[in-house]
UniProtKB/Swiss-Prot annotation:
Keywords: ATP-binding, DNA damage, DNA repair, DNA-binding, Helicase, Hydrolase, Isomerase, Nucleotide-binding, Nucleus. It catalyses: Couples ATP hydrolysis with the unwinding of duplex DNA by translocating in the 3'-5' direction; ATP + H2O = ADP + phosphate + H(+). Residues 217-254, 1224-1247, 1260-1328 are annotated as: Disordered. Belongs to the helicase family. RecQ subfamily. InterPro entries: DEAD/DEAH_box_helicase_dom, DNA/RNA_helicase_DEAH_CS, DNA_helicase_ATP-dep_RecQ, Helicase_ATP-bd, Helicase_C-like, HRDC-like_sf, HRDC_dom, HRDC_dom_sf. This is ATP-dependent DNA helicase hus2/rqh1. GO terms for molecular function: 3'-5' DNA helicase activity; ATP binding; ATP hydrolysis activity; DNA binding; four-way junction helicase activity.
Amino acid sequence: MTVTKTNLNRHLDWFFRESPQKIENVTSPIKTLDFVKVKVSSSDIVVKDSIPHKSKNVFDDFDDGYAIDLTEEHQSSSLNNLKWKDVEGPNILKPIKKIAVPASESEEDFDDVDEEMLRAAEMEVFQSCQPLAVNTADTTVSHSTSSSNVPRSLNKIHDPSRFIKDNDVENRIHVSSASKVASISNTSKPNPIVSENPISATSVSIEIPIKPKELSNNLPFPRLNNNNTNNNNDNNAIEKRDSASPTPSSVSSQISIDFSTWPHQNLLQYLDILRDEKSEISDRIIEVMERYPFSSRFKEWIPKRDILSQKISSVLEVLSNNNNSNNNNGNNGTVPNAKTFFTPPSSITQQVPFPSTIIPESTVKENSTRPYVNSHLVANDKITATPFHSEAVVSPLQSNIRNSDIAEFDEFDIDDADFTFNTTDPINDESGASSDVVVIDDEEDDIENRPLNQALKASKAAVSNASLLQSSSLDRPLLGEMKDKNHKVLMPSLDDPMLSYPWSKEVLGCLKHKFHLKGFRKNQLEAINGTLSGKDVFILMPTGGGKSLCYQLPAVIEGGASRGVTLVISPLLSLMQDQLDHLRKLNIPSLPLSGEQPADERRQVISFLMAKNVLVKLLYVTPEGLASNGAITRVLKSLYERKLLARIVIDEAHCVSHWGHDFRPDYKQLGLLRDRYQGIPFMALTATANEIVKKDIINTLRMENCLELKSSFNRPNLFYEIKPKKDLYTELYRFISNGHLHESGIIYCLSRTSCEQVAAKLRNDYGLKAWHYHAGLEKVERQRIQNEWQSGSYKIIVATIAFGMGVDKGDVRFVIHHSFPKSLEGYYQETGRAGRDGKPAHCIMFYSYKDHVTFQKLIMSGDGDAETKERQRQMLRQVIQFCENKTDCRRKQVLAYFGENFDKVHCRKGCDICCEEATYIKQDMTEFSLQAIKLLKSISGKATLLQLMDIFRGSKSAKIVENGWDRLEGAGVGKLLNRGDSERLFHHLVSEGVFVEKVEANRRGFVSAYVVPGRQTIINSVLAGKRRIILDVKESSSKPDTSSRSLSRSKTLPALREYQLKSTTASVDCSIGTREVDEIYDSQMPPVKPSLIHSRNKIDLEELSGQKFMSEYEIDVMTRCLKDLKLLRSNLMAIDDSRVSSYFTDSVLLSMAKKLPRNVKELKEIHGVSNEKAVNLGPKFLQVIQKFIDEKEQNLEGTELDPSLQSLDTDYPIDTNALSLDHEQGFSDDSDSVYEPSSPIEEGDEEVDGQRKDILNFMNSQSLTQTGSVPKRKSTSYTRPSKSYRHKRGSTSYSRKRKYSTSQKDSRKTSKSANTSFIHPMVKQNYR
């Protein structure tokens, strides 16, 4: 017997009552789970026993070997042997009548009932119910036995006289098929209901389940008739009448439901049911399609889902009409003139049985207990076959609840975990993150209209003999302090110290009416009060925590210690534009000042800021523009002198720190603003900073004694997983196709070429909706792809790591790293772009140790001193340690890096380690490590880490035998270990500093990493036995010899904080914070042939690092250009049948690919290019090079460097005097001067109103990045107008090609300041 939508509730009830052990050998009739239900203020409270936690997917509890089977293919379920004649009906229906199921009918017949007809009968009763008083158990609601009082829609279908006998004590209207009966009971007893509009014209009674006797006697509700003397006779009568019932298919098409006559509250309840059923059917369809692709069972659910969609549309239309009408009927919000019917298509209802009316348990509980709820959040909840009743409330009865009733009500088990609050996104940060929420209760919220809240308020009032709480009051909490799984909810009080500031009422008003939010998340209110008090504030919040609101809301407050313009320094134009778009929708005057704007727009912005009445609230600039632009400096000076500079905000503040993973030199100069604008409060915000980075930010920005606010970094909805990088595309497709085909995701790659290859492979070979996104694309194309992805046309975006920082998309369900990231900070930030809506999301990293060579090459070719590069290597080693760790919880490792203690018990299988069932033990690998050290010492020449490991394992490869390495002492010792443990051992020795990998380039420009001994002090500690090398190995792995000792599995995690070079699996500390730069060799242990190891090909290194810094993008361009140049050379050689010497050698082509000469003259400057070859062969090769020159120029067009403010030729700030304290610019040296804000602008002034209108109109027309509709580009060539900034500087060429020619040349002349970023600042923000 297969579980279906119609009988799933029976199976669930029976399954949780009987254990799996009882299922197989069941011989007695199965007793279903009792449902105990009582009505309190017309809200159904359901209490059940032995029901799993509601957040758990009920399908997870089913065992394939026992009862439940969801497909047609598997017919081994033990339920196949059960007979429904032995199954007792649910006790919930006993007071009136059980659903009689003929014993002769099969389960398949039971599934074929026309559920639409049953729903119509039920809903006819539902809509005919006026808002009633609360009905207790043991009493039946009744009005008349006359058949003329039967609902009209049922009279159209059935003749009640065929079923009703005048002398029956209980009369019923039966709508039945061959295998199922729906009964609507009527009694002849009078109705003792207290109501203003009692129902007297309807011969219908409502089936209400029994409440236990001990409670029902105390509640002041009418009673149900519990006379069951005629039950047996009625059952027999029902079975006899089945044959006389019309078939479902013959009547389905005649049923139409007039939703316009329903009470408003009933419509809301019914809408929740429809949405829940549609969601469940959709989940079922997707599950069957993906898990059982050869089954066609899902097809029968598609028409059901379509009918539900039509019903939802009909109900929403009525609700919309109700909202637009003047309804004074309380909860009975009907629209007499609105005729909105739903008639199910006969073709559909005849083919497919409609699902039964079943209500998820959580929906019943939510509708009766939750102050604020979204029905769509209910998914995969346990469902129960619960008849639906009106939730309308008659308020006079609320005051009749007595103290004894309250005590008995408290016996019900209402789990705090069932209270959920849908928190609205506080500006760019999606809802649902694990953070605290302060919910503001006011008269316009619908919280107070929930029946259970009113009952609870009345109950508390009865106990305390106090009056009911008023819905408009902020003085007391409604339900006090409540906790659920994700949020700690605090109702604010005006007596609360956080709301006792002079500006508190203005803050609450702006939150509601300006930003349309209902509350604050954790630390938001504290940050707002801090900055409005004139304090410096440092905010550390995870992605999705609501950082932007902390400075956007204070910007519109007039009552703070400072008022005027809030200066926001943001690193990315896309991030700026995203916030500006949101502020524009809120009508908050906010403007950018960037080189991306046309000159006339920049002049307009400056005019708004220099006006007498400055109405601009937020001004967004980039750090590069602030450091190099005199115009911005003059504007800020004017605002400061007029007391109109409110605060300075540094977004993404981790860019300030040298220790940060994304250091920007221009951010380092922001500390000078402290001297220039004395008395102005600073605010620094970041989502990724450990303790060292935080202290560096505070010291650099001179924010001593600032208010520090830190939220938890934990993202409980993210699942972390690391997979080996083997059979990558198969693994990618397997993951995406297993439940993620229709979901949005990001795949991060290391280079632009990888992005294109991965996207093309997934799109062409696997049919996935994937597209690449990177800086090599034209700006218009990038905008189009991003918009298509955000709208859902593309499900997967394959991009480089910068993508996603400025993208506001909360429903990203997975983030995949094609290669491991450069730091744990970067990993946390990139994975944080998934699941910002609070729903579960998956984070996967494909790990291969050899990928680190690419990062080593970038570090080697990058700018910065030895200390800077060593810090980069430290961050890289930490990522390797994180990936190699097989025992410690992933979440715990990440949070430990940020200095947050986390118990892995709370991970709840939220990572691959916690889901791992394998047993790991600690193995002492010190003896093996000593043999590896001796082996490396005895090797003459260069060897990679892989070659050293092969020698250690006794490999007999040709190169090893040729060099005689197989005869060295220690060769073959590692045979006792399996290869996986050997690899992890050598990687562990590298992370511990015992071995060091030295990256070098060969003559052809290819980079290799050769292994050499590390610091002598570390090696000596291992040789002396002071440092033990401990490795986690699977218990089934090959064991070392008896000399190794086994340790118990570690229960603690060594800290990752403070950049200590320690292994997460080792028991030793190796602090790097106080360590000097490693010397590769020490005099106490000289290499056998140091000249060979130290030797470098200096010419090749100079060729490779002719520029002191080459970004990842530039290396990618160089590689592709070199490939095309070699291809051209091969074609020319084939035509002329000549040798390489007749053309350009590989080294010459490499220089051409790096320098990208534009003409023959520049080509001649390359070493090895003769005049003859330059003239004869140069034009052909220059045509290939020109393509890459154009690409780089297009890429520079979207950079955040402001070309119109100084020059595109500057990568770093050259005019450092722009931030100096010179008296000529009018700044005072008086450090004791007090900065006082200006007076607020008076509202109502015509000039002010006109200027505000001009600013808002300008905001709607400004074109920083054109995030709206993407314009069509007429031509790829572009010519600047004659009044461009280059014309003012006397440039002789205005063509776009010429515009970037100087930039192309001078970009090689980078500053000598340390830059720890792997990606060049000029191209970083668009290198996606």
